[in-house]
């Protein structure tokens, strides 16, 4: 008996990510420095941890409602209203999820059907496509490499018209992984002017919204496209809480009434103690990202200076904590091969650009969510490698 042939056929479209393949290829290199992680190197603020401890001591160990604690939804509502001028009712327009990843899964499985198309500016975070594929839908990438990784209204409308009636949604992630680019209010208004002409969902992955470096606050498309937008956010990046798995969905009540169905049968509810910690994070800790941002800016600028001097082309990222650098001419443009050789010779790991789709080939992504000491040593070894290659 061979039951493997009876698995969901959509799984055949899903492969182990190139990130994991690359990690496995270099995993046995002793003492390797990793600038690969998509999570803060900072620890969760002490006052947030104390709130979780209090919840445990008070025996807050039972299920919450499917939507999450009302106190948390109120805190989240106040937070996004103050920070981003978003207006979502805590009673019926906010869902608490197990990380932004579950928020995305619940959203995409709720809105997509077999044969649907989803537009995605590329290069892009590789986690969207497997979810889309599992429901029998298809990602259609929009190449942004010739425009500084920024989606323009013209590019967007052209892609919308090409897909026709099968187009169900657009995913827009900003500040973006892997490029670190973000959008100004004017750029978003121009995109919104296109999007509101079409009956499609706009899924906004804004999990890096607290990590912007322009001096201006993050602008959410939810302020412009309330009747179309589903906003995904979370506390992993803003409060260094990746392991707590706490995400949020903000959407109109008519949307959440449907989204809660997929959320409920995926997970029932988010972790209760983590929810109590999140209340503290979004109230007393609403500015906890500020010290991290100062460190990230210093690290970003140091890396850009060093890599630019070595011939890498870099569009300065205005958010998140990634550098997406084009491999200089004259070197191996196969990002996997280039970085595998670099790792083997100098014991430093970045992520191949090809891990972020075909439009990422020829680039490397490195995370500056690492100590300055680690970054300086990595840049020193990179300089040696480029000189010797």
For the regions a language model picked out, list residue spans one by one.
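PLP-dependent class I/II
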Residues: 1-7, 12-15, 20, 25-29, ...
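A short acidic, glycine-rich active-site loop
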Residues: 59-63
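Conserved N-terminal alpha-helix of the aminotransferase class I/II PLP-enzyme fold
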Residues: 64-98
């Amino acid at each position: 008996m061979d039951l493997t042939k009876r698995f969901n056929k959509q799984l055949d479209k899903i492969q182990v990510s190139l990130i994991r393949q690359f990690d496995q290829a270099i995993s046995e290199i002793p003492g390797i420095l990793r600038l690969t992680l998509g999570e803060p190197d900072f620890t969760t603020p002490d006052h947030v941890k104390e709130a979780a401890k209090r919840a445990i001591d008070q025996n807050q160990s039972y299920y919450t409602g499917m939507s999450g604690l009302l106190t948390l939804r109120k805190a989240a509502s106040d937070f996004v209203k103050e920070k981003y001028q978003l207006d979502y009712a805590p009673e019926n327009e906010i869902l608490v999820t197990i990380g932004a990843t579950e928020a995305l899964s619940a959203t995409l499985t709720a809105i997509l059907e077999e044969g649907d198309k989803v537009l995605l500016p590329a290069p892009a975070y590789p986690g969207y496509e497997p979810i889309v594929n599992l429901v029998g839908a298809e990602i259609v990438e929009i190449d942004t490499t010739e425009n500084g990784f920024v989606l323009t209204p013209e590019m967007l409308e052209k892609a919308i018209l090409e897909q026709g009636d099968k187009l169900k949604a657009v995913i827009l992630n900003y500040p973006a992984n892997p490029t670190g680019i973000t959008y100004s209010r004017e750029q978003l208004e121009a995109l919104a002017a296109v999007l509101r002409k079409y009956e499609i969902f706009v899924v906004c992955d804004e999990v890096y919204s607290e990590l912007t470096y322009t001096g201006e606050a993050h602008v959410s498309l939810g302020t412009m496209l309330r009747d179309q937008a589903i906003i995904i956010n979370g506390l992993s990046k803003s409060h260094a809480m990746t392991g707590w798995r706490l995400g949020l969905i903000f959407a109109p009540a008519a949307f959440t009434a449907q989204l809660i169905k997929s959320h409920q049968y995926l997970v029932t509810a988010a972790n209760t103690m983590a929810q109590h910690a999140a209340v503290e994070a979004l109230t007393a800790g609403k500015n906890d990202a500020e010290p991290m941002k100062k460190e990230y800016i210093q690290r970003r600028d140091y890396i850009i200076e060093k890599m630019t001097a070595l011939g890498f082309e870099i569009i300065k990222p205005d958010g998140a904590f990634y550098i997406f650098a084009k491999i200089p001419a004259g070197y191996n443009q196969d990002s996997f091969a280039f970085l595998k050789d670099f790792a083997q010779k100098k014991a430093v790991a970045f992520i191949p650009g090809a891990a972020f789709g075909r439009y990422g080939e020829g680039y490397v992504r490195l995370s500056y969510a690492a100590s300055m000491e680690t970054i300086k040593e990595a840049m020193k070894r990179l300089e040696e490698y480029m000189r010797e290659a």
